[in-house]
Amino acid sequence: MSVWRPSDNKVYLPPPPVSKVVSTDEYVQRTNYFYHASSSRLLAVGHPYYTIKKTPNRTSIPKVSGLQYRVFRVRLPDPNKFTLPETNLYNPETQRMVWACVGLEVGRGQPLGVGLSGHPLLNRLDDTENGPRYAAGPGTDNRENVSMDCKQTQLCLVGCKPAIGEHWGKGAACSAQSNGDCPPLELQNSVIQDGDMADVGFGAMDFSALQTSKAEVPLDIMNSISKYPDYLKMSAEAYGDNMFFFLRREQMFVRHLFNRAGTLGEPVPEDMYIKASNGASGRNNLASSIYYPTPSGSMVTSDAQIFNKPYWLQQAQGHNNGICWGNQVFLTVVDTTRSTNMTVCATVTTEDTYKSTNFKEYLRHAEEYDIQFIFQLCKITLSVEVMSYIHTMNPDILDDWNVGVAPPPSGTLEDSYRFVQSQAIRCQAKVTAPEKKDPFSDYSFWEVNLSEKFSSDLDQFPLGRKFLLQAGLRARPKLTAVKRTASSSQKSSSPAKRRKTRK
């Protein structure tokens, strides 16, 4: 007797359709008008290791280190309120204007130099590279004064949203932990803000939460979070607003090899070594196996600089090809090749002989920037498809353009009182429309306002002349040669020359 059985093969249905992300080149029309904008000389001076506070709530001297991120929030003028070269360039009823970043140069002042970082009480037990003898067990306090030069990093990252960083932080444990247990680690993402510490060679992690001894790393990152740009996340971002492009150069080598003092939370398993004989110079008590190096960025040279050079954006890595939504640009910079820490000495008491106590020593670090941009004027036609796409991407863009999208019909009945000032009803004065909040107001950036620094005379600026040269364009001459006219004379012809005669 034959029996029918259904097929055991699984049936795979096609995935549901999703909205496709398109490039800005599909709906942004570029014009032939370019503008130059540059900041003034941007300076920052402070202490390279920590913030100086006179009172708990008042900062006297900020922390300014060559190992910090500098994040500039560049404000641009609204092109829809901009004085345009042609009145018929666009139709304000059906079109809107936007800026596109096509050129950039980050200028750095100050000489090249290497700044030292360190800790007067660093957890440094033994020299594990050239140990002359097998070290005995650690004492109660083996901390020493150690300084080092850190990893060398140069970074320039541009987008219309802040860059995203990653670091390892303390995660939530599944069960209760005892004192001294290793906390679970969690990869965390956060916005890179101005003043955040970059990776200096000790990893991207939250040192204040994961190193409670305050003796494991140098002073400048001890109570901080070292962040590393999450290039994978920003590259995979759907619209490509966080990163148009980036320039990066990193190098590091190991200078010294040490180990750390302390009780090993996870001792070396006994099956990984053979025990020493009795009395073998203390080798039955294993030394600390928590090894770590001191980093070094090696030589600093002008041949390997990514700054003070122009860069042109032809095609961005994401779908946003340089369009500055919200009329702003976020520029993230790291440059450890100019991290010189200046020593300042002030006299306390003047004597004929030298005494170190007669002087006070101070540390300062100074940074100098000059930012130049080339922007292209673009226009967008407000069709139904384009407006729907932009509303899905970021509805705040349409709000800034004063373009409203009709909301769906509401099924609720709203109340409207006749006498608003009447005391017989609840107070209507407290019912106010919510103000529009800046989505980045909770973060710290270096504000740079270029609203009044746009110029169409590209040949009057260094970056503008470079742009004209690489684009094969020539500026129109400002001066025209004027032909000199002959002066009018009363005589119609010049007098004839006298002939020479022979005698």
From Swiss-Prot:
GO terms assigned for molecular function: structural molecule activity
GO biological process: endocytosis involved in viral entry into host cell; virion attachment to host cell
Entry's localization field: Virion; Host nucleus
Keyword presence, Disulfide bond: yes
Cellular component, GO, one term: host cell nucleus
Region (Disordered): 479-503
Superkingdom of origin: Viruses
Keywords in alphabetical order: Capsid protein, Disulfide bond, Host nucleus, Host-virus interaction, Late protein, T=7 icosahedral capsid protein, Viral attachment to host cell, Viral penetration into host cytoplasm, Virion, Virus endocytosis by host, Virus entry into host cell
Role played: Forms an icosahedral capsid with a T=7 symmetry and a 50 nm diameter. The capsid is composed of 72 pentamers linked to each other by disulfide bonds and associated with L2 proteins. Binds to heparan sulfate proteoglycans on cell surface of basal layer keratinocytes to provide initial virion attachment. This binding mediates a conformational change in the virus capsid that facilitates efficient infection. The virion enters the host cell via endocytosis. During virus trafficking, L1 protein dissociates from the viral DNA and the genomic DNA is released to the host nucleus.
Similarity-based family: Belongs to the papillomaviridae L1 protein family.
HAMAP family assigned: PPV_L1
Subunit structure and binding partners: Self-assembles into homopentamers. The capsid has an icosahedral symmetry and consists of 72 capsomers, with each capsomer being a pentamer of L1. Interacts with the minor capsid protein L2; this interaction is necessary for viral genome encapsidation. Interacts with protein E2; this interaction enhances E2-dependent replication and transcription activation.
Protein name per Swiss-Prot or TrEMBL: Major capsid protein L1
